[in-house]
Amino acid sequence: MKLTKGCAYKYIIFTVLILANILYDNKKRCMIKKNLRISSCGIISRLLKSNSNYNSFNKNYNFTSAISELQFSNFWNLDILQKDIFSNIHNNKNKPQSYIIHKRLMSEKGDNNNNNHQNNNGNDNKKRLGSVVNNEENTCSDKRMKPFEEGHGITQVDKMNNNSDHLQQNGVMNLNSNNVENNNNNNSVVVKKNEPKIHYRKDYKPSGFIINNVTLNINIHDNETIVRSVLDMDISKHNVGEDLVFDGVGLKINEISINNKKLVEGEEYTYDNEFLTIFSKFVPKSKFAFSSEVIIHPETNYALTGLYKSKNIIVSQCEATGFRRITFFIDRPDMMAKYDVTVTADKEKYPVLLSNGDKVNEFEIPGGRHGARFNDPHLKPCYLFAVVAGDLKHLSATYITKYTKKKVELYVFSEEKYVSKLQWALECLKKSMAFDEDYFGLEYDLSRLNLVAVSDFNVGAMENKGLNIFNANSLLASKKNSIDFSYARILTVVGHEYFHNYTGNRVTLRDWFQLTLKEGLTVHRENLFSEEMTKTVTTRLSHVDLLRSVQFLEDSSPLSHPIRPESYVSMENFYTTTVYDKGSEVMRMYLTILGEEYYKKGFDIYIKKNDGNTATCEDFNYAMEQAYKMKKADNSANLNQYLLWFSQSGTPHVSFKYNYDAEKKQYSIHVNQYTKPDENQKEKKPLFIPISVGLINPENGKEMISQTTLELTKESDTFVFNNIAVKPIPSLFRGFSAPVYIEDNLTDEERILLLKYDSDAFVRYNSCTNIYMKQILMNYNEFLKAKNEKLESFNLTPVNAQFIDAIKYLLEDPHADAGFKSYIVSLPQDRYIINFVSNLDTDVLADTKEYIYKQIGDKLNDVYYKMFKSLEAKADDLTYFNDESHVDFDQMNMRTLRNTLLSLLSKAQYPNILNEIIEHSKSPYPSNWLTSLSVSAYFDKYFELYDKTYKLSKDDELLLQEWLKTVSRSDRKDIYEILKKLENEVLKDSKNPNDIRAVYLPFTNNLRRFHDISGKGYKLIAEVITKTDKFNPMVATQLCEPFKLWNKLDTKRQELMLNEMNTMLQEPNISNNLKEYLLRLTNKL
């Protein structure tokens, strides 16, 4: 048989690989015996070299294609070669020919020199040995997710999977810098395909293993922490004989054993610094005990996930993937177990030891050490595990549950110097417990509940079972050293974490795709609680304002996704305002549709059916559907369509048309819904949208019907009201009954009437917003036209005089909420405005806003000043100044209104207002004297107040952070010099997330300065992001928030922002968190 040159070449390669197989070292589980490894590599290299001179062959035939075409993996059974060579050949067809096999053979030489399993960047790209390849029955699919196929047409990055998005404990995970290439022709980033690990909701499979009980011993020392774990395990019904794979990142192994038999690395298991794989033939077929002892380093863990050190406190943060940085575990939310935890540490340094559940006992250890044992009788996923050790002081109280009269001990902990700031948190906890009992009928289920404040925390708080851990700014407050907003924040965050005890803990998630089931639902519960506790209309308006200015922007950006995403790379990147805030509105709509009585029935069904188990969004919808059937008295009624809210991205636009038949006294409302298609969802379906409406008599402003809720389930529908005596004004989406854009098609006169007389605060607020938006868009286009045409003089449409009179009417209304008045004198937030303007010129928008404020101020500044002075006595009353258990939210709203008015008057340079600013700076309330610093930016007293307020703030870290925010948002031309001053004199080398966010994020809201046409604002923030990414990827990604609006800006600014994002993507050690976020944001993933 005559062979072609190409065919001959294939069989030469085949012969070399046969040799490799013969020399395979079974004992060491190594591909080729070490003494022939270099020789084999030399054969390959010489063959490649000779081939490079083979002129008739080298241009037309690809070495890797030759091997690929042989398709050895179809008939070769040797698992090591199949996975480590042949699968890599298929995945690397386009790489240099010497790269593939040479790299795989030579890399093991270096690996053998590093057997201690400490953090090793060289391990990042290693394949896992001894595991099933492409087995569709693989039940450990959470860590073996397949990359996208090229046919999907989606760009991908290297090793971006669910587990590799954090730093290793001594540095940044080293990603292959070759993943991102610069294309000089269009300054874009080209990302090679077939590299990230994409996790899909549709690929969920139960684990092949069960963990029943977890016994942990955590021994804390100065330079290391030793963690010994015993897992009581079993084989699940889904097991198909696969390897036992544990998640474990950056762990140094002391010992691995099963049923007290030590396992041998390489022969019975492998560890690649990310996954511990125990080969299936060494896994027992029934119940067994898996034990491990590892060493970790919380003292150098600056990523603040897993176990880390905040000042002198050892603390954990395990959601979503932190537990794997403490010990080996099958780290997924449906792996629920009972925990028995013992913590030991130096008694002088760490006198307080805490973990989940009830404390069983405490004990002394020779050598000045001590320990405590904790038992949590409730099943929980590992992300709810927590441990704290430190020199902490506390306040405590006893709570008696409503139904069972059980005594619960409540403790709130902090550093000693901040104990006096714990009282409000303790009050909020008691209020939360009572609310959950009264509204939902849910009692606390342990005998003790601990809340702990720590200074270094990536997010707001964490709901760990029985041991809630808080960012200090979400637990500590005093009237002397905290801004007013701190009290509302603590109320909501303490409530949120407590409410998770049922919605998140006792009923947890089947998988991370269901995140909104615990977060959206719990935010909804938190909102109900805070609205009830504050009794102010502005509490609900603040939630609406957040959604419409932040989440709506995300929904129209390249980051748009449903509240339940269908795929993710890094789970931490999906803790978004969509999942949380839009998710909470989706959960709230059930209440709107069902009414309180039937909503509670549905909620009760959900808890009883799923208590102690995992759940999905379908489970919650099923429970609400049962209540819907009850309400409708119709067993055929269903909420199947409602599930589209969980799967469809984007914000619906709902528009209205009206018809009144005077003869029939019949009023018709025609409604249409439309959601814009996007790149991920080309087709959008009609949603189930509840529309709470009222009808207002235009002659006297009174209600003509009782409020009712319309159910829009089609693209268009018409709703008819009978016996309507006069043509009414519709009051639409009362209480913001659905998260949609409302196109009401009302006249300004009708909106003004609603603003003045409607009984619903949201409708009044929205009517005001719509009038503002009409004026903004009109004036913006006039300014833009003048700029583009270089006109020296031009006419601008004045603000409607009737609207200004309506604002005056409401300001002078003694019954109107002071916080509501703050909203109506303020233009909509920039991030809300941006949703209505394409190719935004930020300078033009700034000019537009200044013009409108001046138009209104010229007529109302005297009214503003009069109100500013008249409210002073009540707003700054000191009767309860020293009583931290008494908080008056109405009084706080008065201070908010006064500070808003002072800002408007300062911008307008109102006569003698500087004297008022100086006097205001003497107030004992921090919100007041920080406002005086902020508004002094318009005067030459700024640096005088800068120094004065710094001295007032510097000894309290949380108050200093509020001061930093105030300085950062200063509306001054020299803000860049001021930020540099903050960096050098205050921030310095701080790695504290609160400090970093405080210095930079407020600045990004400055229309003129951050969006300076030179691009220096974008460059500054990009440099901060890159620097932060080296030690804390999660915070680095949070700092990307201002880049979300890049595609809304004008062409020049789009280009500048895109250039900075591309520069960040080219960083050689960019984290997976940041890489995925930027790739999605720039439409590359």
UniProtKB/Swiss-Prot annotation:
Residues 108-130 are annotated as: Disordered. It is found in: Cytoplasm. Changing V459P: Severely affects substrate specificity. No effect on Zn(2+) binding. Inhibited by 1,10-phenanthroline, EDTA and bestatin. Inhibited by (Benzyl)Tyr-Ala (BTA). Activity is not affected by phosphoramidin, PMSF, leupeptin, iodoacetamide or pepstatin. Heterodimer of the p68 form and the p35 form which are derived from the p120 precursor. Displays aminopeptidase activity with a broad substrate specificity. Preferentially, cleaves after Leu and Met, but also cleaves after Ala and Arg. Low activity towards Lys, Phe, Tyr, Trp, Gln, Ser and Gly and negligible activity towards Glu, Asp, Pro, Ile, Thr, Val, His and Asn. Has dipeptidase activity. Plays a role in the terminal stages of host hemoglobin digestion by cleaving the N-terminal residue of small hemoglobin-derived oligopeptides. This is Aminopeptidase N. The lineage of its organism: Eukaryota, Sar, Alveolata, Apicomplexa, Aconoidasida. The gene is M1AAP.
